[in-house]
């Protein structure tokens, strides 16, 4: 009798359409993301879950975890079981391969645009009327200006601020020594370093600390929209391209049987619907039609890449981000 029941079950499974068989994985996945992406991925998840249900018949829940990108990477290495990561810095995904062998070496080649479905740049949020007349990076090191951004030792967001400021100073001032002094003054103008981007936003917006919040352009626009008439966005003439890399955590999805779901989730970010959601939250995207639709939202800016300014992430890690390297030296001497 048991054999008959087993045979019937197998036959029934074989008769299911491929999409339904695909949905046989777990009914939950975990997206571990950077600190200021909560609202964005709530919107993404709602749309993806609806599409997944229509495609597979499965009721899916996408759970979210948010903190500073580098802290999240460490948590995954220490055992947090993320099915997917949606980070704001390439190095925080790469470390999952280098230190935990949790993602494949070719993770950046698995999806378009170096596995970065959207991008942004460090920009400035100032109080209404721009009372300190902030226009560019060199305004941020004036004695009368106080800044707010997270700790670059724990926040990928803040590392982009550090790298963008350093690249600007080195190009304009012409030497590493002068760039070092510029960044030390930048750090000295920060009265408090929060651990992540959202905490820094709270410090600036709710506690009313500082004259300028430096964060991703997407976050500055979101805050401006949330508090009409209280803030304005300043996009500097030049900034650093901030890619937002995504990846399935191979060891976790293979262990949980969630690879198909995780892959579909990341693929969704590249669809017209996914790109539209990303752009609605003020992220710059790659889909030409979506770019055209939202072009008035994004002022022109010269974006420098990490390759152009620093020779790539490997060099940045060794020369700037490693323990005792440039960032540590400048941060401690601020």
Task: Report the location of each language-model feature.
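Extracellular/periplasmic juxtamembrane helices and adjacent flexible linkers that interface
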Residues: 253-334
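Ligand-binding pocket segment of bilobal, Venus flytrap-like solute-binding proteins
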Residues: 172-237
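Short beta-strand->loop
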Residues: 107-116, 138, 224-240
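A bilobed periplasmic-binding-protein/Venus flytrap-type ligand-binding module shared by bacterial periplasmic
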Residues: 122-130, 243-260, 277-281
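A conserved helix-loop-strand patch within extracytoplasmic ligand-binding domains
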Residues: 97-171
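Alpha-to-beta junction loops
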Residues: 79-85, 144-146, 207-212
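Short, low-complexity disordered leader/linker segments with a strong preference
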Residues: 1-28
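Early extracytoplasmic/lumenal segment of secretory-pathway proteins
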Residues: 20-99, 109-111, 216
């Amino acid at each position: 009798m048991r054999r008959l029941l087993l045979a019937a079950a197998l036959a029934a499974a074989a008769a299911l359409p491929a999409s339904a068989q695909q949905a046989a994985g777990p009914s939950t996945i975990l997206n571990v993301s950077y600190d200021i992406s909560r609202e964005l991925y709530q919107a993404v998840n709602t749309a993806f879950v609806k599409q997944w249900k229509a495609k597979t018949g499965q009721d899916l829940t996408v759970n979210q975890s948010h903190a500073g990108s580098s802290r999240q990477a460490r948590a995954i290495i220490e055992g947090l079981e993320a099915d997917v990561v949606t980070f704001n810095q390439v190095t925080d995904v790469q470390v999952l391969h280098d230190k935990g062998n949790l993602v494949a070496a070719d993770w950046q080649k698995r999806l378009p645009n170096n596995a970065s479905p959207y991008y942004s740049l460090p920009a400035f949020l100032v109080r209404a009327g721009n009372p300190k007349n902030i226009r560019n990076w060199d305004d941020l090191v004036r004695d009368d200006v106080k800044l707010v951004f997270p700790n670059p030792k724990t926040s990928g967001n803040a590392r982009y601020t550090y790298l963008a400021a350093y690249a600007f100073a080195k190009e304009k001032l012409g030497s590493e020594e002068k760039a070092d002094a510029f960044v030390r003054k930048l750090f000295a103008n920060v009265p408090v370093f929060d651990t992540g981007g959202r905490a820094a936003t709270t410090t600036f917006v709710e506690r009313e600390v500082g004259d300028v919040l430096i964060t991703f352009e997407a976050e500055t626009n979101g805050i401006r929209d949330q508090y009409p008439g209280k803030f304005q966005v300043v996009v500097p003439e030049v900034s650093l391209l901030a890619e937002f890399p995504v990846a399935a955590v191979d060891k976790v999805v293979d262990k949980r049987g969630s690879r198909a779901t995780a892959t579909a989730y990341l693929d969704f970010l590249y669809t017209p619907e996914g790109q539209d959601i990303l752009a609605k939250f003020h992220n710059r995207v790659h889909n030409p039609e979506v770019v055209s639709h939202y072009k008035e939202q994004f002022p022109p800016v010269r974006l420098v890449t990490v390759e152009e300014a620093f020779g790539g992430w490997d060099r940045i890690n060794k020369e700037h981000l490693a323990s005792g390297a440039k960032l540590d030296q400048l941060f401690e001497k601020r």
